[in-house]
Curated annotation (Swiss-Prot):
Keywords: Ribonucleoprotein, Ribosomal protein, RNA-binding, rRNA-binding. Belongs to the universal ribosomal protein uS11 family. This is Small ribosomal subunit protein uS11. Part of the 30S ribosomal subunit. Interacts with proteins S7 and S18. Binds to IF-3. The gene is rpsK. InterPro entries: Ribosomal_uS11, Ribosomal_uS11_bac-type, Ribosomal_uS11_sf.
Length: 131
């Protein structure tokens, strides 16, 4: 009889990182939160869609807040105490995500940067909606 292949889950190695960088990507459809160390190696991540928000609920400020809280709770397990914030995009969850990082206990915000790419008359924007 053939052996069954049993999938084994990789063990998450707990790192001891004091400082991290929180990348907030706030699009019109979703909010992605990625936490890295200072070198850019990913520690943990979370998205509004990954937390169970589907459809238009993913783009709400509440979903962005929940995504930040989820990512920071994972990052605290790795010892993150001080963070810098890099924000990209102009979605509705942008401001709420920044505020909820600052409101989280045990995490000190050192700096905030906006890394949204600005085009100098680049691609043609999508046509206007007709409702």
């Amino acid at each position: 009889m053939a052996k069954r292949n049993v999938a084994t889950k990789k063990k998450v190695v707990k790192k001891n990182i004091a400082r991290g960088v929180v990348y907030i990507s706030a699009t019109f459809n979703n909010t992605n939160i990625t936490i890295t160390d200072e070198m850019g190696n990913v520690i943990c991540w979370s998205t509004a869609g990954g937390l169970g928000f589907k459809g238009s609920k993913k783009s709400t400020p509440y979903a962005a807040q929940q995504a930040v809280e989820s990512a920071l709770s994972k990052a605290k397990e790795h010892g993150v105490k001080e963070v810098g914030i890099k924000v990209q995009g102009s979605g509705s969850g942008r401001e709420t995500a920044i505020k909820s990082v600052g409101a989280t206990e045990g995490v000190k915000v050192l700096w905030i940067k906006d890394i949204t790419p600005l085009s100098h008359n680049g691609c043609r924007p999508p046509k206007r909606r007709r409702v």
